[in-house]
Every structure is written in C-alpha cells, then in structure tokens.
C-alpha cells in the first residue's frame, strides 16, 4: 500500500472513526492514519481495524476525537504505529504512539519498531529455567519467579498491587542493575505521576522506561499501550541481549479497553459483555513475552479482579498464560500484614525440588502445611478458644502466627509513609529464617518481633531488646 494516500472522515462514533479512501488506495489493517484536529492543531492517529466495503475503513483513535468533523482529510502513513527503541528512551515517559509526555525534549532514537510484531520462533526460545530473586520473602519462598516467565498479581482495589510492583522495579534496578519497562494501562494518572517522582527520588529512573495510556485516555490508547511497552522491551532483549522486566499495571484494563472498542466495531459481545476476541487479544500480547537465547523478558502483571470474582472471564483468561501467581488478600491486608500476599493461594510452576533445590522446596511446603492447618483450626478457635486445642495444635497455632508475621516485610518505596527503612532479603536468608521457625528454634521469641522484619537476625535483635 502506497504511503500518503488520502481519504476523508465519513462517520465518528466516539473513539471509532470511519474513513473513506479511493478503492484502489485502501490502507492495510493496523496501518496508522493521521488527521489534524482543527480545534487543537494536533495530529490524531487512527489505527485501521476493519475494511467494511465501498472504500470505507473503520479505525480506532489513539487520542480524543473531540473537534474532529466529517469531511476532514486523513492521510495513510503506510505503516503501523511505531515506537522509538534503544537506550535513548531510558528515563523517559512515552504515550502509545511513542511521543514523550514528560516535557524533557524530543527523543532522538535511532530506530523505531512497529508495535505489531510476531512472537519469537520456537527455535529461538530458551529452554533453561532460572529463578529471578526479588528480595521479597513471601514471593521468593512460596511463589518464586522464573526468569523470562509471566507472573500475575491478583487482587481487588486497594490491597497493594501497585506498591508491590514499585518495590520490584526498585529491587531489579538497584540489586540486579536490570532494565525495566513499565506499561501504565488504564490506571490513575496520579499513580503514574507518583511512580515517576518515586523513581526519580530512588535513582532508578535511568534504568526504566515508562509508557502510559491512563484512565482518562480513549480506549484505543489503553488497548495498544501494552504493545508499545512490549516493543521497547523486545528491543532490549533481542538487540542488546538484556534481561528485561516488563510491568503491566493493569492487564484487566487492557481487556476492558478491548471490550469498549469491540462493541463500537460492531462485534457481538461474548460472556459478561467482553469482546469475542478476548482469548486472541490476550494471546497475541502474552506470546511475545518470553526468553530467547539472547535475553529475556520477565513480565509482572497486576490483575484487578472485578468484585473479587476470580472466575470473571478477564482474570480467568489471563490465568492460562501465567507461570506464577501472587494473590493479594484483603483479609491479610486488614490484619495489617504487608505485602498482603496470600501464602496458600499464591503459587509458582517452578516450586519444584529439581529447580529450586530440595531444602527450598521442603521449607516452602512446611510453611504452607503449618498455615493450612492453622486455617483449618480457625473455626474451632472461634467457637471454643485456643485453650481447648490439643498440645500439637497449640504448637501449630503458635508457629503459624510467627510465620504469618515473618512473611511481612518493610518496603523501600513505602519508607516515607511508614517511617521504616526497607529491607531486601536474599533467598538463602529467607529459607534459613523460615527453617528456624519450623524447627522450633524461635518458639520463645515474642510474636511482635517477627512483624515487619527483614531477615531472622533482625528478629533475634528485636527479641533481645524486648527482653532487656
């Protein structure tokens, strides 16, 4: 298709714009079209989604269509939406079409890549399994992250998904010197601004790219922004051979944006009003996130669970792609235990003695066993009280409460809110700490000493102070 062919707008339905072209000059699907908004003088990018006959193409706008009118001239760029790639984008904030939104000047990238790209061939993909250490005890012990894997953070509103994501970005940048790409998909602009300021303060911004398509933006931008971020991450993996962390906050908003445009594009809705192409849309994004022989992209995806219903089609479709799941629980958050990760619902496919080692596996299973038994005893405790339990069960409760508290941890990114300095705990320290609790070596240490501690030595220090 020749670049520069011209058409004109024939219909505008919110974010969906129909454009008529000469029959012999129709743009391809996914081509980016440009139209100048007469009210603002700014160009609006339209992405071709359907060819509907008689020279008319149906497009989705990447910016507000306020001010556009029928009859306006539209130009075909002859190519899909592209994103700037390379080290020039580090430390910058971009929008869905790769424009800077941080008022820090133009991005002088040497290359731009199209955001629609095929997933790596099977022969290019890596088959080795490695653990990515996060420094967060509950994750490293019970739901270890595979390098190049996909990890889901499930939770309702306000249980701490975004804070956990911010801590991971900080740990990867400072402890691992890795690059991170953050895709803000349909989340609050305030949170994006806070994240940017937080990263400037902690000095990790130089290793990070932020790509935002926030709540106030049209569904087209929210639907495509994850692909823009992924394209930038793919460059670091494929050309520079880096291990990259891709954060998507929130993958549910990606699905939600897709369902918003789907009905306007004239597609019949499927279950719960979602788009009929839900599984395909999700697959096209997720299959590009993988390890190759050159480098890896490990993806952490915050997943909002509508009305805390995990069977909703959006979270349920995401589940199929994940290697590890971190479930955040309102019940644990209400106890004041942060991160509010549910140790029984969270899991990882690599928690296997052949991968993590026998000791790690046995300590993790031992911790879950004690916590599960404690959960089973809750009804008896509520009715009869702890005193009516057998000595063995009393010991289970005693240790479970210490484990529960030791799973909490102060975060670096929350320091200015909590006043507690953050802690990064290596995996070996985490395993050693929980092993000592399971072996009964700390049965005489007060519960309170375990709360919001780093490693087990810090707990012992606190216990000494409490006794003195």
From Swiss-Prot:
It is found in: Cell inner membrane. Keywords: ATP synthesis, ATP-binding, Cell inner membrane, Cell membrane, CF(1), Hydrogen ion transport, Ion transport, Membrane, Nucleotide-binding, Translocase, Transport. Its EC number is 7.1.2.2. PROSITE patterns: ATPASE_ALPHA_BETA. It catalyses: ATP + H2O + 4 H(+)(in) = ADP + phosphate + 5 H(+)(out). One of its GO terms (cellular component) is proton-transporting ATP synthase complex. GO terms for molecular function: ATP binding; ATP hydrolysis activity; proton-transporting ATP synthase activity, rotational mechanism. It comes from the Bacteria. InterPro entries: AAA+_ATPase (IPR003593), ATP-synt_VA_C (IPR055190), ATP_synth_F1_bsu (IPR005722), ATPase_a/bsu_AS (IPR020003), ATPase_alpha/beta_chains (IPR050053), ATPase_F1/V1/A1_a/bsu_N (IPR004100), ATPase_F1/V1/A1_a/bsu_N_sf (IPR036121), ATPase_F1/V1/A1_a/bsu_nucl-bd (IPR000194). It is a peripheral membrane protein. It is an enzyme of class 7 (translocase). The keyword Amino-acid biosynthesis does not apply. Pfam families: ATP-synt_ab, ATP-synt_ab_N, ATP-synt_VA_C. ATP binds at residues 155-162. Produces ATP from ADP in the presence of a proton gradient across the membrane. The catalytic sites are hosted primarily by the beta subunits. NCBIfam families: atpD. F-type ATPases have 2 components, CF(1) - the catalytic core - and CF(0) - the membrane proton channel. CF(1) has five subunits: alpha(3), beta(3), gamma(1), delta(1), epsilon(1). CF(0) has three main subunits: a(1), b(2) and c(9-12). The alpha and beta chains form an alternating ring which encloses part of the gamma chain. CF(1) is attached to CF(0) by a central stalk formed by the gamma and epsilon chains, while a peripheral stalk is formed by the delta and b chains. This is ATP synthase subunit beta. The lineage of its organism: Bacteria, Thermotogati, Thermotogota, Thermotogae, Thermotogales. The gene is atpD.
């Amino acid at each position: 298709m020749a670049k520069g062919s011209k058409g004109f707008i024939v219909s505008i339905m919110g974010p969906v714009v129909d454009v008529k072209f000469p029959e012999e000059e129709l743009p391809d699907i996914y081509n980016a079209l440009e139209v100048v908004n007469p009210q603002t003088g700014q160009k609006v990018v339209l992405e071709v989604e359907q060819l509907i006959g008689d020279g008319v193409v149906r497009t989705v706008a990447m910016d507000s269509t306020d001010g556009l009118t029928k009859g306006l001239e539209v130009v075909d760029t002859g190519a899909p939406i592209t994103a700037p790639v390379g080290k020039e984008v580090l430390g910058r904030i971009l929008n869905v079409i790769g424009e800077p939104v941080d008022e820090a000047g133009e991005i002088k990238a040497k290359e731009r890549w199209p955001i629609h790209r095929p997933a790596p061939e099977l022969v290019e993909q890596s088959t080795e399994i490695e653990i990515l250490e996060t420094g967060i005890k509950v994750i490293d012990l019970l739901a270890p992250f595979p390098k190049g894997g996909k990890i889901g953070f499930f939770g309702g509103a306000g249980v701490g998904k975004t804070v956990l994501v911010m801590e991971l970005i900080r740990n990867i940048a400072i402890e691992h010197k890795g690059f991170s790409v953050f895709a803000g998909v349909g989340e609050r602009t305030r949170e994006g601004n806070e994240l940017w300021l937080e990263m400037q303060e902690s000095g990790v911004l130089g290793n990070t790219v932020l790509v935002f398509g926030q709540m106030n933006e049209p569904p087209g931008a929210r639907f495509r922004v994850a692909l823009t971020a992924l394209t930038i991450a793919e460059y670091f993996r494929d050309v520079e051979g880096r291990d990259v962390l891709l954060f998507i906050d929130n993958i549910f908003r990606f699905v939600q944006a897709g369902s918003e445009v789907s009905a306007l594009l004239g597609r019949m809705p499927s279950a719960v009003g979602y788009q009929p192409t839900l599984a395909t849309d999700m697959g096209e994004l997720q299959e590009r996130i993988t390890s190759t022989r050159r480098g890896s992209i490990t993806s952490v995806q915050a997943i909002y669970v509508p009305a805390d219903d995990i069977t909703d089609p959006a979270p349920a479709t995401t589940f199929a792609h994940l290697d590890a799941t971190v479930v955040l629980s309102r019940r644990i958050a209400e106890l004041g235990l942060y991160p509010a990760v549910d140790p029984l619902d969270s899991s990882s496919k690599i928690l296997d003695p052949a991968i993590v080692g026998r000791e790690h596996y046995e300590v993790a299973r031992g911790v879950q066993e004690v916590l599960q038994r404690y959960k089973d005893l809750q009804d008896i405790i509520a009715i009869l009280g702890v005193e009516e339990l057998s000595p063995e069960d009393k010991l289970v409760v005693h240790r479970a409460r210490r484990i529960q508290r030791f799973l909490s941890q102060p975060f670096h990114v929350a320091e200015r809110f909590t006043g507690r300095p953050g802690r990064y705990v290596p995996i070996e320290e985490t395993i050693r700490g929980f092993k000592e609790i399971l072996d009964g070596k700390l049965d005489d240490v007060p519960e309170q000493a375990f709360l919001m501690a780093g490693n087990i030595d810090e707990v012992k220090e606190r216990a000494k102070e409490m006794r003195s």
